[in-house]
Amino acid sequence: MAGTADFSAGGFRFIPAVFQYSGGVAAAPGYAIARVRFREPLPLREGFGRVERHIKEAGRPLTSFCACELRSPAPFTEQGFRAFNEVYVVTLQKWGLFDGKVNPVARSNVCPEGDPPAEPSFHAFSFTVASADAAPSFVISGSAEAREGGASYRERTIRHGETSPDALREKGSYVLGEMERRLGAFDLSWADTTATQVYTVHDLHPFLADEIVRRGAARSGLTWHYARPPVRELEYEMDCRGVTSEHVV
């Protein structure tokens, strides 16, 4: 598993990325990942409280919190996104997950175009549970069409400012490739997924069959959220997972 690091306190491995999230997580041997979705989005502070209670009631340490799916009112500016992330990681630091530099927790954060929450909120979260014989389980973080790196989002974005069918195909192809790269870091592929999610307000049908389906990303179907990525002028995002259980609370 080249390019991954162990987070033994939580029972998972992760792909190191940026301070606000990792590139993805996979359960360590002897563990599995369980996903919990809230029926309605919960504001960040309330959501963290519910997550804490749920994990403790399951008999797991808070360090088992390995992924979350957030919803925000509207795309952030770059400065606004950083300010939000600096608030978000405070709880992770209190829980023993974030050491001030390395963050092992996977994440997606998108902005529903219809009926958005009034403030950043929890949609779902995942945590590890003990499991002797579970199939590989994992959560790959959301990725939009911006390359990782130190430059601004504008400089890193594929076909910045373009939303033509050709530009969206190129954006989608890049994001699919990034999903595949992250899956590969755990020696996994689309065949191991139990769910794939797309977040865009644009028509993906022109490249649905020959990109998403052909590459195997829709083997368990495709969940399309009519939502935007979390930073302004990004147009297309995906994430995927392979988990052993999913609950709605």
Annotate each language-model stretch with its function.
Residues 1-249:
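Short, polar/acidic, helix-capping and beta-turn segments at strand->helix junctions
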